[in-house]
Amino acid sequence: MIRVSIIGATGYTGIELVRLLANHPEVELSSLVSRNASNKPLSDIYPQFIGRIDLKFSEYDCQAICQNSDIVFTALPHGISQEIVGELYNCGVKIIDLSGDFRYKDSAIYEKWYRENHHYPHLLEKAVYGLVEINRNSIKRSSLVANPGCYPTASLLGLWPVISENLINLNTIIIDAKSGVSGAGKGLKRGSHFVEVDENIKGYSIGSHRHTSEIEEIIKTFSGNQKAIVSFTPHLVPMKRGILATIYVKLKQSISERALRELYHKYYPDHGFIKVLPRDIFPETKYVVGTNYCYIGLKYDTRTERLVIISAIDNLVKGAAGQAIQNMNVMFNLPEYMGLKQVGVFP
């Protein structure tokens, strides 16, 4: 059994890790760390685990975690996470970090977009970007995986086949994405209050969202150092979970929609977590709620000569906890599906 610790276990992402790992046949939950809930039983705060998991939350103790864990998930805010990861890395335990602290190779880019000093730049070279569908072999060999952001996951999976085949102009990428409120985290803020969110849609961080730089940097890293310019606009919509990303790109040459669909099927075989939908069927967030799947739909608009790509994920699963578990499975040579075979909740 793989002994697992989760640091930041009371947040939305942390508790989603607990929910999914509770059904993983090769995992033993070793410790759940939460500063705010220390010494309280898990089931006192989250009653859905009554009779399922008999664990109490504990304070962070680096030595104890290293002794009792084969892998640690850090589900903490950026800035805080890097300090914990820096300590844990020195004791040799495997780590999957769900913050943005280790997704970049260049600390200057991180510091520019996150407005936070990076105290462990030497670990940026060791960290592997954890988007399994494009980086599987490197993840297998890694002991520190940077779990991708939710918006970059939906966007990069939608773009990857046409980027890999050099079919699009990288300075024409436009991404319009909608996210449920859980993407804003559990912390209290006015913008997340029910009366602010209900019956309302709004854009935010226009032209300045941190995930813009993550998308651009990953495209550059995995496309032979080609520079991408991405126009990314996120929106908050009144639902709990889900991301729907609509992506617009210009093709370098004429190619049929049928050929594009065949290309996507080649990159994403039917046995994987990415599902390419038939012609004129497009993703909805309802298809993926509670699952680790990403649904992708394609349409070549001949009038504007733009390829429109729509992708849908659950921001807490494929966009966070589920993807982290998929990474863990790869790191331990387990089937990628293990513990992640959930079908979408409907209605």
Curated annotation (Swiss-Prot):
<dbReference type="GO" id="GO:0006526">
    <property type="term" value="P:L-arginine biosynthetic process"/>
</dbReference>
<dbReference type="GO" id="GO:0003942">
    <property type="term" value="F:N-acetyl-gamma-glutamyl-phosphate reductase activity"/>
</dbReference>
<keyword id="KW-0028">Amino-acid biosynthesis</keyword>
<keyword id="KW-0560">Oxidoreductase</keyword>
<dbReference type="GO" id="GO:0070401">
    <property type="term" value="F:NADP+ binding"/>
</dbReference>
<comment type="similarity">
    <text>Belongs to the NAGSA dehydrogenase family. Type 1 subfamily.</text>
</comment>
<dbReference type="InterPro" id="IPR000706">
    <property type="entry name" value="AGPR_type-1"/>
</dbReference>
<dbReference type="InterPro" id="IPR050085">
    <property type="entry name" value="NAGSA_dehydrogenase"/>
</dbReference>
<dbReference type="InterPro" id="IPR000534">
    <property type="entry name" value="Semialdehyde_DH_NAD-bd"/>
</dbReference>
<dbReference type="Pfam" id="PF01118">
    <property type="entry name" value="Semialdhyde_dh"/>
</dbReference>
<dbReference type="GO" id="GO:0051287">
    <property type="term" value="F:NAD binding"/>
</dbReference>
<dbReference type="Pfam" id="PF22698">
    <property type="entry name" value="Semialdhyde_dhC_1"/>
</dbReference>
<keyword id="KW-0055">Arginine biosynthesis</keyword>
<dbReference type="InterPro" id="IPR023013">
    <property type="entry name" value="AGPR_AS"/>
</dbReference>
<protein>
    <recommendedName>
        <fullName>N-acetyl-gamma-glutamyl-phosphate reductase</fullName>
        <ecNumber>1.2.1.38</ecNumber>
    </recommendedName>
</protein>
<dbReference type="GO" id="GO:0005737">
    <property type="term" value="C:cytoplasm"/>
</dbReference>
<comment type="function">
    <text>Catalyzes the NADPH-dependent reduction of N-acetyl-5-glutamyl phosphate to yield N-acetyl-L-glutamate 5-semialdehyde.</text>
</comment>
<keyword id="KW-0963">Cytoplasm</keyword>
<keyword id="KW-0521">NADP</keyword>
<comment type="pathway">
    <text>Amino-acid biosynthesis; L-arginine biosynthesis; N(2)-acetyl-L-ornithine from L-glutamate: step 3/4.</text>
</comment>
<dbReference type="InterPro" id="IPR036291">
    <property type="entry name" value="NAD(P)-bd_dom_sf"/>
</dbReference>
<feature type="active site">
    <location>
        <position position="150"/>
    </location>
</feature>
